[in-house]
Amino acid sequence: RRFSHQNVLFVGRDSAGTPRYAAVRSCKGDFKGEVAGSDKRFAFSLEQRSGPVEVHVFESAIDALSFATLKKLAGADWRSVSLLSLGGIPPARDGEDLSVPRALMQWLDDHPLCNEVHLHLDNDEPGRASARAIAERVASRVPASIEPPPTGKDVNDHLRAVLAQRERARSHKRETDREGR
C-alpha cells in the first residue's frame, strides 16, 4: 500500500515490550500528534546496552534521536545511555504546580537502579521551567542535571547548527585544496 501522508511513527513500549504509546510526526510540515489511546507513561525510549543506568530526557523523540546523532558524530556510543522522550511537556497555567511527567516517573519505576537523570528540555521558558521543576521533584530519588542545548531552541536545532558548521568546514577545505593545486 502506498502512503500519501509521509509521517513517522514513534512507538513506546511497556517493560514487556507491548506497544502502549505512539507519537506521529510529519516529515514535511509541522503536523504532530499522538495516536488515540496512547499511554504517555510509555513514551518513546531507547534503552542503553549495559553499565550504570542513566537516562537522558527530551521533550520529543526527534530531540532524542538528534542527541544520539550528536553522540555518534562525537565518536561516542549513543547506546551507552538511555534516551527518553516525554512526548511533550504540559503547558503551565498560572498558579499551577509543574509535576514530573508520567513518562519519566514510569521509566524510573521500571529502572530502579537509575543513578542519573539528564534533562535536555527545550531552551525556552516552558522547557527551562519544566526542567527546574522536574529536577527538584526527582532529587530525593535520583540526581538530575539540567542540560539545555548549547545553541538553538532544542537538541534538533543544535544538531542542525553542528551539521551546518561541519558542512562549512568541509566546503572551506575543498576550496583551500583547489587553490593549493
Residue locations for each model-derived region?
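TOPRIM fold recognition
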Residues: T69-R181
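Short active-site oxyanion
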Residues: G51-H56, E116-V117
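Basic, glycine-enriched DNA-binding surface that flanks or lies within the catalytic cores of DNA
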Residues: R1-R49
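Helix N-cap/beta->alpha junction signal
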Residues: E59-S60, N123
